Amino acid sequence: MTAHVAPISLDFEEGIDRKTLRRLRDRFLLVNQQRWNRAHSALSYRQQMVLEILPLVFHLNHPALPGYLDSDCPYGLSNYQPSPATINAARRLARTFSLKDEGKRKPDLDAMFLMGSPGTLGHSVASDLDVWLCHRSDLPERGIRCLERKAEKLARWAESFGVELHVFVFCASDWRAGRQRVEVTGENCGSAQHFLLLDEFYRTSIHLAGAWPMWWLIPAEREETYDDCMRKLVDYRFVRAEDYIDFGPVPAIPEEEFLGAGVWQLYKGIDAPWKSILKLLLIECYARTTGEALLSSQFKRAVFCGETDADRLDPYVMLYNRLEGWLTGPEVASRLDLIRRSLYLKAGLPLTRSEVSGEQWRARLLRQLVTGWGWSENTLAELDDRQRWRAEDVTTLRRTIVNELTHGYRLLSKMARDHGQRAAISANDINLLGRKLYAAFQRKAGKIEQINPGLAPSLAEENLAFHHQSEQGGDADGWLLYRDLEDPADAFWQPVIRRSGNLAELMVWCYCNGLLTRSTRLNVRSGTSIASVSELREMLDALSAFLPFPIAPAEREALSRGVRPLRNLLLVNVGIDPQAHLTEKGLHKLSSRHDSLGFSGGRENLVISIDQITFNSWHEVSLQHYAAGDTLIQCLKNVLASVAANPDELPAVQVHCHNRGHGSAIARRVQELFADVLRPFFAGGTGPHPLRYVIEMDRRYFLLQFNGLEPGFVALDSFEALMEHLALPQERYLPVVFDRYALQDEPALRAVCLASEPDNIQVFYRILGDQARLWVVDELGSVFSWEQAVTSRRHLLVPVLRFLDNLIERRLLRHTDSAGVVAGVQCYEIVRRDGAWRAEYRPESDSGVPLPGFEVQAVGIHEGDSRLRFDIFCGDQEFSVQEYGDQLIPAVAHYIRSLRHSDEVYPVYLTDIHLPHDLDPRVYQQDIQTSQYLYYRSVLEDSLNRHLARTR
């Protein structure tokens, strides 16, 4: 084969001839055939069949061929005649296949091309096949959809042969007009890069069938007048229009396209860095050397000048030569070295090994390059030995790659801003790509960094040793990770793989990066901790069940939505004995209480620490450690916060606790708690719903509730403090929900809150001998409670019912409609029947016969910044603050006492209270909540009754 032939010159002004054009076309076809042969030879026997038969399955709509859908699917490739090898391949697939004459039927398809790395130095066994299938511009939408479905079916067939095939269906006129119907996926660049992709197509494509590129016939120096030249060729019939397909010229890359293209290559670089680094640097080179010829133009000029040597025209060789010529000087030596390593690893051809059958030309070409680079055999051996790369090697290389990718993105982004250009990428695409970049590269607190984005085949270690720093003397805390450390004494001289203050974080990092597998031998030197090999083995099992390795990249659909948690794994008490202080005393359980949050007679909370591992929809893994303060409540609060934005899909919560010290019981209790809390807050796939959730733990009470989308909690040290808090006013109806183990000593209160209803005032009572406990749940769910002596049910209820009736009546008078008015007062008795506590409805017991006595009313007044005071009216007798000052309560008590017989001893009850609308000086309250009236009623009654008792 002649590598260099006579140059061809086309002078559109002086005249051209058809013979020269045919000679030029044949020269491009010669280069094309060499590339096809190279692409074919790089495939296995079964894979070669896919490449051979591709044009035929679209040229014929034959039911025996792969991808067939129905008889209406468009077919037929312009000017295509299958070769004997193609027909034989079809008959190997379907013995009944025979080629039929289609007559003069107009083909539906214009051309088919293979583009990218096949047939080039950059092709490897992992490379996919990207095919452009171009249809007629007048093809109906239904036909286009059918072709797309056929392409998808064909891709599934090719996958069974070990080929990753992607067929993109479009027409050339849509491409020229920028109307391509694509979005960002793993295989095409959406709106990100039009001209850069066309530049790549022209220099890498292999013509498979149909019309030839019109671009071949337009000299490189005439790209600026491409359309005029093309029209002259067609109008003057130098070529037949149906023989050529026109994707348009690439005179230059528009500046506004660089940002989109850069982001796209970063997107690809997350999973396939070597190719993307080369392309990203080419984009930067193009951006910095505007005015210089593009690689596609250099390729075309070389063919016009007589160059047909496939080695010298290899797209990756040309790309490298362009970058090498651009990166000159010692200050860019490290970047040039990264380019060389990227090209070598992209080729995927280990030169230090002899198994290169079928790859002789690639091995020869690659060897020429590395010889010119001056690489030593040690450098080659290091790159060829990727199977033995360790975490430290990958971490260093990843840092270099991330720095280069980040540098490229920032530079291109700045250039786009400086030129004031609008990036040639849609807002949706750039948002999507940015999210993937963020998920892969962004560092943030707690995120587990994944260090091996396709750099090494595996980082699995045979032996890993976890050493607590206290093993090395002193009081240092934290953990060190070693490999192959049989003798602990060698730790001082062995390199540390990783340091962490947290054993769980170290384990998760090892697992997510593939260092730790089920076959890895473990060694633990726990020091002051009590961690063990068995605990780490159990933790590994929990991690494997929670998150299969390797972690797949997030799907496009997930990245198009906001990030949300998919599932959580809670590791409880890692390396901790929660009963250590009891064990030292020889005590394990001092009562029948088996709640892990209030264990034994001491009500001990056995949850000391939690490591919360979260896997989210962008496939990020994060770990948050809780070991100080209210560990469990803090973790619960953060889980609630993460769910609030997406309540329709609750994340799964798994809990693991080592079997030491009631581990399974602790895990079960924590899992129950999280399920119990999430359920009412997000019932029905909506929320967060307004409610207050009460948890009893470690001799304290915790009340959880949301403020908007933000959860918060209040810790209360006693039952009395809890009741005071439940009585506080609310902005809206907030029912009280108790955890299944909370307040088991107060079953009546649980029954009261369970029976609570909105827009009602409910009075509950329980009589125990001569004492009664009353609870009032008001219209917004506040719970006010008190105890009092009881002589009869009527004497117990009538005072409070009349007080509430007066309050409701006054509200009715203030409102012109029913909005904001409670339905009324309902009475319930708390009883225990069949071992269960329940609230049973009791009609109001006021018989209509008035109780003896007179009305006692209080009217609250605010004077300036002074505290709230009350004027009190006993029947028609007024006692004002102005007149009595601090002696008002004693004066009222003395007056009431004077009206009673000397032997009468019973409490006084207020029948009504008026509160000012500026009770809270910060706001004007149109309707003051019932619980606030009850609070001031209780304060005044207690004060009056104390003074009554003193006057006896």
Question: Where do the language-model regions lie?
Answer:
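Amphipathic alpha-helical scaffolding segments
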Residues: L129-H135, L139, C146-E152, R340-R341, ...
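Catalytic metal-binding acidic patch
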Residues: F113, T120-L147, E164-V169
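Extended helix-rich, non-globular scaffold segments
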Residues: S127-H135, E141-G143, F161, V182-N188, ...
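Nucleotidyltransferase catalytic cores
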Residues: M1-R91, G178-V182, N188, F195, ...
